[in-house]
Amino acid sequence: MDCRVKINGVQTNQFQLGESEKSMTVKGHDRPLTAGEIEMAWTVFKDSIDYDKVRVHRGSYFWFDMQRKRTAVTPDGHMYFRDEDFLEDFSAASVADGDMSWFMHEMTHVWQYQLGYSVRWHGLTVTIRGERAYQYTITPQNVFHDYNMEQQGNLVADYFAIHVLKKYQAIIHRGYVGAPEELDWVLAPLLRDPKNMDNLPK
């Protein structure tokens, strides 16, 4: 359920200008992507995602609010954030850079799902490795499809942090100390043709 009320002093942002309304999503309900969020995702995924199909849920994906704190779940093409982590617009000027990167990580799972990748199933088999599942190492012989679903999410998030936000402090993979050109190399196949299913994890 969306409540839309007129308010004064709404901030604009670099992705969406001229907004005069603010949407409020009730816990247990969802909202569509904002225009600013779509612009964020477009910087990487272009038109490979049907953005109208994506919903952002306010509340745990799991029963009894069992979703871990500071954890989002995107198993079915929709994002599920705990109540305290949910934002009405991840592109807003007031949003922390790290949360924008987090949003891009989750959009990677949306992209994977819409291209036919079984995010729910592979999520069970990949995340069982714990933090190691998310950490990546860039090597000359590896390209985007050589990384698992969570590593891909972090690669996209860090690319966005460095190349779009231009803020190293917003990177998700804290072990990353390489040059921006290394991320360019790894993401090149995805950026060139985000509709190509060959970019999905092997």
Regions found by a protein language model. Name each.
Residues 1-39, 43-64, 68-69, 85:
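Hydrophobic or amphipathic, alpha-helical segments that drive membrane association/targeting
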Residues 1-11, 61-70, 74-76, 116-133:
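Alpha-helical membrane-targeting segments
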Residues 21, 33-38, 42, 48-49, ...:
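Metalloprotease/metallohydrolase-associated module, dominated by Zn2+-dependent proteases
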Residues 24, 77-82:
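Short, aliphatic-rich beta-strand segments
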Residues 47, 66-72, 81-104, 143-145:
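Short pre-active-site segment immediately N-terminal to the catalytic Zn-binding motif
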Residues 59-63, 79, 85-87, 108, ...:
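Short, solvent-exposed loop/turn segments at secondary-structure junctions
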Residues 101-113:
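Active-site recognition of the HExxH zinc-binding catalytic motif
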